[in-house]
Amino acid sequence: MPEERALRAWAVVSRPLVLSRPVVGRASPRLQSWVADDNPLSLDGLHLQAELIRLLRDYGLVQQAVTVAREAVVTRYALDLGRDPLQDREAVEHELGRLASGLQDQAVRAGYTSETHRLAELWNALTNVRNDINHAGMRSHPETTANLHRLASELAEKAANWIARNVDQPE
């Protein structure tokens, strides 16, 4: 059942929040096991996060979908690089930003593999859409509301696909 998998994903992603609340003691043993057993910073945890992103998008919660997607992209890229997704998070985000900035320089862009180019475009788009949403359009050249909702929905799906891809699958 998709809703059950999405609830499991929510439990995994929200572990720090869930564990800090007394409600965990009253939660079903099944929910408690989801929180205890899955590591959101693992490939299995990322597959659950991809499901959560899709569920949020399907319910029209595109801001939340984009937020989870952006964080999960950082985690997945850290794992792909063999880095610690928690300890090296800031450095990995900086690297993603550097890749996205490289799109502006033709010489840098020419050195990108197709996979790196797609990742740089995904990160750049996620960052721009997130900024448009979180800054309530108070930016130069913000997207229109209708276009922003469409873009956020499309990006959420692209990010979910990238996050959940197989290890041996290209970016």
State each model region's role.
Residues M1-E171:
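Long, low-complexity, Lys/Arg-enriched
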